[in-house]
Amino acid sequence: DHRDLHYPLRRQRQMCIRDSLGEVSVSLPSLHADAFAGELGRRVATMRKTGVTLAPECGTERLRRVVNKDVSEESLLEAARILYKLGWRSLKLYFMIGLPTETEEDLVGILDLAGKVARAGGGRPQKVTVAISPFIPKPHTPFQWAGMNSLKKLANKVDFLKSRSNDRALVLKWHDPRTSVLEGVLARGDRRLAPAVERAYALGSRLDAWSELFDLDRWRIAWQEAGLDPFFYAERERAEGEIMPWDHIDCGVSKDFLLKEWSKSQAGEVTPDCRVAGCLGCGLPCAGAD
């Protein structure tokens, strides 16, 4: 979150009032749980109510530590209380499934936490949309060494959540695991994927962002014709010493730092925000760095 987001919001509202453009409406996606405890909360309270998404990402504090999101359940519930007091009557929570070390307890925790958020304001439960997205390990992150869940595992986890979602206050929505598999292959692939991408296009894969037009079988044909195994790219856990297809790209953060963070994540150790704790030696220039 931008730490001074309330400044541009105030300026935007002033400009709209000055130019007689009417009331300001702002949608705030994927905010940290404590974002509304202060000036930002007071600022958005004066605006037309639109969508607000909080992103706990995981159903348990244990798994949030694994992904270095040190957000307590109580801080999330307090954020919900503040939003309800400010006038919101529905919230959206963003979660991921398929994260490293994830267990059934973590999946159950998604619905438990969402149910608590729905009732955080006291009285009648408020509507909470539970948005589920499969985790995709991305390059230049500590999880670039992790393997992605298979399509079958992801589909089973979505089915598990659907079968357990019997709270009328909750609306469960999910990202299609099939498109996530494709995203995982493309995100972690190398130059050998280029002919497969061209072949998939020739087979009709053009508007795959639209679910009604997406067909994973076209991509499977393209991968097979190119002699490629999607498991090799998406699902395989990578060795720490493996040379990655993107290693030649310098994004500033060192691979050694990412590897340390990968080890810490598996141990559930949280790395503090360098803006608070000081330079952590990631490789990017910052105040206090040597």
What are these regions (language model features)?
Residues 21-26, 90:
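Short, surface-exposed connector motifs at secondary-structure boundaries
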Residues 31-35, 57-60, 97-98, 135-137, ...:
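Short, glycine-/Ser/Thr-/acidic-enriched flexible segments
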Residues 27-43:
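Flexible, glycine/threonine-enriched loop-and-boundary segments that flank and lead into catalytic domains
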Residues 166-290:
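Radical SAM enzyme core and accessory elements
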Residues 36-40, 61-67, 97-105, 123-152, ...:
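Flexible glycine/acidic-rich beta-alpha junction loops that bind and position SAM and/or redox cofactors
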Residues 1-13, 17:
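Single conserved hydrophobic/aromatic residue that forms the stacking wall/gate
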Residues 42-54, 58, 62:
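Active-site-adjacent "gating/activation" loops or surface patches in catalytic cores
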Residues 29, 51-52, 56, 70-141, ...:
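Conserved C-terminal portion of the radical SAM core fold
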